[in-house]
Amino acid sequence: MKKRHYGMLSLALTSCLAVHAENKNQNTDKPNVIFIYADDLGYGDLECYGAKNVQTPNVNRLASEGIRFINAHATAATSTPSRYSMLTGEYAWRKPGTDVAAGNAGMIIRPEQYTMADMFKSSGYATGAFGKWHLGLGDKTAQQDWNAPLSASLGDLGFDYSYIMAATADRVPCVFIENGQVANYDPSAPIEVSYIKNFPGEPTGKDNPELLYNLKPSHGHDMSIVNGISRIGYMKGGGKALWKDENIADSITAHAVDFIKQHKDEPFFMYFATNDVHVPRFPHNRFRGKNKMGLRGDAIAQFDWSVGQLLEALDKMGLTQNTLIILSSDNGPVVDDGYDDKAEELLNGHEPAGN
């Protein structure tokens, strides 16, 4: 039986929030809820909080049409514990094992725990999770079989549908997980993952820097190489299932928009956790060079685009006025987080944490 903890579920750890309170088929007593969770986005990284070197028009819309918080706090300074608290309503420091999770960590939130998704599902909502997860998968750490349905996944936590990253973009495995199994699984390239030792014959960033054609590490992040970028942890295989970093935002956002379309006639809850602006920052080419801050600024612009795609979908389907949108970051900003992307050198007076 699931334990119910309501205390923190009503706490909005928000950067900008908009209540868009026309689809006549929807029950207005149950507004849709979209929780947008940015990664490592700072208070000062958005125009609505004073950013000058990057444009965020879609987030600006949320701020101008809704409520902009100027005093809000995350429960932790890193990803895993902050997300744990948000989804469970519990302080992470009360639970062992909620520090920054490896990509092969077992599922930290246990199926018997009552989650935010459970709360919405029990109220008749369709529930979906998209993007960065970083709370473990499978029943036990390092015991996952990535070539079969995972023994524990988001379906056990109240989510009807999920399309997520197992951990973060800088940690293996570099594949999407859809409803508890590797998306676009390639049987010709079975997946193996280790956070202890490399697999024989597999190149690493430390030993084969000549293979890092997309991004090089500034410190750490020198293990397995995927898409010309070295990561934390070791993996083998993946084949066609491996993501391309420049397409992560497109893929996550497209699946989220499809979810909105599929559930436009019923109340839905969406947990939309972007990879942006976490490292490795390798946004799509169409966002490159649009600001003064290099790749980190480009990643902020890409994040804003994702927000805009959700807003556009709601507008087109007449759902905007019956949808509550909450936007937050999991924690404060990180500038140099292990890759040589010139993020610090190109701040040009920008203050990610605000002033």
Please give the residue ranges for each predicted region.
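Formylglycine-dependent sulfatase
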Residues: K2-M8, L13-S15, A21-N355
